[in-house]
A protein has these predicted regions:
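PLP-dependent enzyme catalytic core of the Aspartate aminotransferase-like
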Residues: 323-327, 332, 336-368
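PLP-dependent aminotransferase class I/II
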Residues: 50, 218-294, 299-302
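PLP-dependent aminotransferase-like
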Residues: 105-162
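Conserved PLP-binding catalytic core of the aspartate aminotransferase-like
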Residues: 284, 294-327
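Phosphate-binding glycine-rich loop
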Residues: 67-112
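Active-site pre-lysine segment of PLP-dependent enzymes
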Residues: 146-155, 168-191, 195-226
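Short acidic capping loops at alpha-helix termini that bridge into adjacent secondary structure
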Residues: 36, 85-89, 110-112, 156, ...
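N-terminal "arm"/small-domain region of PLP-dependent enzymes with the aminotransferase-like
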Residues: 1-65
Length: 368
């Protein structure tokens, strides 16, 4: 069969392989004939969404109608929570889409992007799709080395991606470090600060987003409803930035990109502050529990400010992952992030964490 059309694909796509999501519970049950599965692979909120979200979804009507293409009600709620104007907000089909929109808007084959090793893989994918050259900067203590970033910035740099906290390592950057970095670069460069896990951070020196946005017009903050809000299946996130910048990005955004159920669910979740606080507290308690267990096992891990822990194993992480699958535990191997001996584990409920530790002990013992 003649496939000459393949020679006309856009430059950069040749080197991309499709993103491999974590295995589903259904797939593992079927493949290994298991009845009990604990999924700790994708950094979802193990408590699920707020009951108020479930109520909104169950009562949803008018599914035959298109959603509000501008998301006015949701933007109004976000503007209240974030203390910004609705004109400073762009909605996305997950914050992932917002990252794609930013890349579409500012990257080309003639421009460059900068991001860290061991950072969210979408930064690299979004750059490659645009045919843009990218600089993957060596990490410092598993996190962003902003001084090294400066060494890779030139007149072609258009985008810089900073995840805070970083996924998959869980490291974070203090507010002052980010401010000093922003002051050191040209305001012609767009800096994307990805805060998908910001709600879980418990440090006094964490980024103060309003101060950043008020001082720097070249910054876009992205946030997600997939993590602490528990709305992963609905795909919804948003970006905040200077109104002029957001207006340009909205020219690229597809019509009706965020569905109506997701918009209503997001509003309900933002309204249930008590539930979000309870999710944060549960995560903190269970994170300490897992730290204690890993310490008892003499396993190294990267202290995390997210709802996940990056664990260094004495063996190949992919093999550990495969053995855990057979025992009914789904975690995330991260050799794609150049961390071949690490696995990333979502912090779950107590019974899930206990099951994981039990099966991890069995797996490590079987490797000796």
């Amino acid at each position: 069969m003649n496939k000459k059309y393949l020679q006309h694909i856009n430059p950069g796509i040749d080197s991309i392989r499709p993103y491999e999501a974590g295995k589903s519970i259904e797939d593992v049950m079927k493949e290994y004939n298991l009845k009990k599965i604990v999924k700790l692979a994708s950094n979802e909120n193990s408590l699920g969404p707020s009951p108020k979200v479930i109520e909104v979804i169950n009562n949803f009507k008018n599914i035959h109608l298109y959603p509000d293409g501008d998301g006015k009600n949701l933007k109004s709620k976000i503007s209240e929570v974030e203390n910004v104007s609705p004109e400073q907000i762009i909605l996305g089909n997950g914050s992932n889409e917002v990252l794609e929109i930013i890349s579409q808007t500012f990257l080309s084959a003639q421009s460059e992007s900068v991001f860290s090793k061991h950072a969210f893989v979408v930064y690299k994918l979004a750059s490659k799709v645009r045919g843009s050259k990218f600089h993957e900067v060596d990490a410092k203590s598993w996190g962003h080395d902003l001084d090294k970033f400066l060494e890779h910035i030139n007149e072609k740099t258009r985008l810089i991606f900073i995840a805070n906290p970083n996924n998959p390592t869980g490291t974070y950057l203090p507010h002052d470090d980010i401010v000093n970095f922003l002051k050191a670069i040209s305001n012609e460069i767009i800096v994307v600060i990805d805060l998908a896990y910001f709600e879980y951070v418990k440090t006094d020196d964490y980024i103060r987003t309003n101060e950043i946005l008020n001082e720097f017009s070249n910054v876009v903050i992205t946030k997600s409803f997939s993590k602490i809000h528990g709305l992963s299946a609905l795909r919804i996130g948003y970006g905040i930035g200077n109104a002029d910048l957001i207006e340009i990005m909205n020219r690229v955004r597809q019509p009706f990109n965020v569905n109506a159920i997701a918009q209503k669910a997001a509003i309900a979740s933002l309204n249930d502050v008590d539930y979000l606080n309870a999710s944060v507290e549960s995560n903190s308690i269970e994170r300490e529990y897992l730290y204690d267990c890993l310490d008892d096992m003499s396993l190294k891990y990267i202290p995390s400010q997210g709802n996940f822990i990056c664990i260094e194993t004495p063996f190949n992480g992919k093999k550990i992952f495969e053995e855990l699958l057979k025992k009914g535990v789904i975690v995330r191997p991260i050799e794609l992030y150049e961390m071949p001996n690490h696995i990333r584990v979502t912090i779950g409920k107590r019974f899930e964490n206990e099951f994981f530790i039990e099966k991890l002990k069995e797996t490590l013992k079987s490797f000796k």
